[in-house]
């Protein structure tokens, strides 16, 4: 599954897949997503409002992204916990590790997630809904559509890419604001700065600190030679 992720593709496949996925994010879908995110966030915060204190990661940062993505894809609420498990397993496989079990678990979860999505996609073809998955199924550009395998891979990528990054952004960003109370107070007084603040927090303490890549051509960096796909950086 991972080999079909848009994130790991080069042109022209990357360009084609990106265009098709972009088609699915229509203004209607984006507005619907915004409403879903607000509703889910409010519900999670309401659940701990009267407690006096809360674990930010456990109460909000961890459950929010997968719940939102699953809802956007039209996944029934009773299956959201299973999506958390699959997302965790797949996300861990992106770390640089030499533990075989990490990749074994990711492989098993990829198979289970694909089997699950196969049924959901078939249902959306028969009964289109007002959700992102239906939009992905129906997305078309230059006469082309996502293949079945590309659909499953794209759904999995949305799940994984939005999971760990959002958890880390909420945690890192909140910690940064607590360490700089003047900036926190400024944001409280001027909530219209929130979008700029999020962009700056992404830059200041990035949710992803490292990623691996394989070079396709011979390049030199610092000043070591990288000899095409033989060397990762």
Residue map of PLM features:
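Cytochrome P450
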Residues: 1-233
């Amino acid at each position: 599954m991972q080999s079909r992720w848009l994130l790991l593709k080069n042109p022209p496949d990357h360009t084609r897949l990106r265009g098709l996925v972009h088609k699915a994010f229509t203004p209607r879908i984006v507005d619907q997503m915004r409403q879903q995110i607000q509703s889910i966030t409010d519900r999670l915060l309401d659940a701990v409002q009267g407690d006096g204190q809360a674990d930010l990661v456990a109460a909000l940062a961890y459950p929010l992204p997968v719940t939102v993505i699953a809802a956007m894809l039209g996944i029934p609420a009773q299956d959201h916990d299973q999506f958390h498990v699959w997302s965790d397993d797949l996300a861990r496989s992106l770390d640089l590790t030499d533990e075989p079990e990490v990749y074994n678990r990711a492989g098993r979860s990829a198979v289970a997630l694909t089997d699950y999505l196969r049924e959901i996609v078939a249902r959306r073809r028969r009964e289109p809904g007002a959700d992102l998955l239906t939009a992905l199924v129906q997305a078309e550009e230059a006469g082309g559509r996502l293949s079945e395998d590309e659909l499953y891979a794209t759904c999995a990528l949305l799940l994984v890419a939005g999971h760990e990054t959002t958890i880390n952004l909420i945690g890192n960003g909140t910690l940064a604001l607590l360490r700089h109370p003047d900036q926190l107070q400024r944001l409280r007084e001027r909530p219209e700065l929130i979008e700029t603040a999020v962009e700056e927090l992404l830059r200041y303490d990035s949710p992803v600190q490292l990623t691996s890549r394989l070079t396709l051509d011979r390049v030199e960096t610092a000043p070591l030679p990288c000899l095409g796909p033989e060397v990762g950086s």
